[in-house]
């Protein structure tokens, strides 16, 4: 959700900014802009639309060694060039890019900026005018003006500030919004995440909330808001350029769907030794053993992954599990058990809603585990423990491999705790073998892409509405499948417990309504779900079945290899990912960048 990139030093700033913004496209945006400066000139260029639209406006004379760039996802004000970043102060001297939400921007505007002229309607423009006022009207130094502004501003922010009269410095600050420093020889960078800087550096420095950074080409100075200098160690990122390219794929989403067998095998090599023994941090196991209830907090796809693992976690750990929507728990935390433990699922590790819950958990002394794809992310730093899902960069906005990797990672956790408790079911659960079979099942499904595309064309070519139904874990997969179809095909789709159809939803079924039924786990589940299929078919529904091998009948549409019931959500979700992909593709939509959506939701 928005992206920042900046560079100061001995590099071509325009090229670096544009390449960086392209790497940040996956975060979601509706406009973009750059500010580039050298000793002789400055250039501010903004555009509504894609990065390609911005690139088309940049002339060959736009050059410099220092600059800041931004992709904007509208929160205050519509998507216009005036509202696009970077924003300038009243005189144009100061230039600012910002991710986050300034909560008291109206108070700042009326209290400090009477008589100022504003070009747009953003909270960011208020912030840069405030900085400019303190320098040009109140005669503070740039650094003191920045600090004073930060003491007034309330909310979440990641700021990168430049002074057009001293273009050899970038001022940076953050609070509740992700930001990284990239380190180079003769240049330094700032960015929302490492993805945008990986072509230029693999050395990074984390900055924490309410810290201020001064970047020059040769030095990075980190202080708190009182000016006390802080020592920050750097680290080397494990990203590879080949991981963030599409290769021969038309869309990242298809590439990431295809990578899931590899991800399963990577998790095996990470969380099991050569003899198949599960290896999970003993401190995490002990913490779960000491808890009397586990609370899984997440949003979107990660929330659905939590549901898909609930039954497995309870059966193998003998600990009750509750699911919570992070955005709701941030405002109203329900009555908790006496010894709770929180598990936060987040692909990016930056989800603002989940972080809000984590801050409360930390204040209450509740132990927490973050399960994430991004080492060094905010949630991984602030939680008590972290498990990485090792899915590799996920660029497409619609999550696929992170969902299946979260389920697999939690399977290792559940088995490890169960074994530590001496639970026979956990001891008998040969996870390495079973997950290897899951990888094979995924590969078998992926070999049937043409069949799925054909089924989608017949089922979803013109529809505006669709339904997924299932029972047990299939219901949880149905919720994720419906979200995926909504996200990238814009088909209104809902996932329902099949047994709930007769309690209201069946009134929506009419001639040719698409209903996709998921069937796995047991003959009992299959029998009852097929009864529901007959109910909707009798009302004219166009039914497509996704059925686990051994439960299939003649006439079923997509057959999925049988896997262990705990891991069935992984195998069963793969056809639904392909269904969403082909539905979007056949409608001529941008599969990787659906409208109005962001990959990492970093504001509440």
Curated annotation (Swiss-Prot):
Claim: GTP-binding is one of the keywords in the record: no
Compartments reported by the entry: Cytoplasm
Superkingdom per UniProt: Bacteria
UniProt keyword terms in alphabetical order: Aminotransferase, Cytoplasm, Glutamine amidotransferase, Repeat, Transferase
Top enzyme category: transferase
Enzyme Commission number, as recorded: 2.6.1.16
One function term, GO molecular function aspect: glutamine-fructose-6-phosphate transaminase (isomerizing) activity
GO cellular component: cytosol
Catalytic residues of the enzyme: 2, 599
Catalyzed reactions: D-fructose 6-phosphate + L-glutamine = D-glucosamine 6-phosphate + L-glutamate
Chief location: cytoplasm
Domain Glutamine amidotransferase type-2: 2-218
Location of the SIS domain: 284-423, 456-594
Keyword match Transferase: yes
GO BP terms in the entry: carbohydrate metabolic process; fructose 6-phosphate metabolic process; protein N-linked glycosylation; UDP-N-acetylglucosamine metabolic process
Self-association and partners: Homodimer.
Function as written in the Swiss-Prot or TrEMBL entry: Catalyzes the first step in hexosamine metabolism, converting fructose-6P into glucosamine-6P using glutamine as a nitrogen source.
Record's protein name: Glutamine--fructose-6-phosphate aminotransferase [isomerizing]
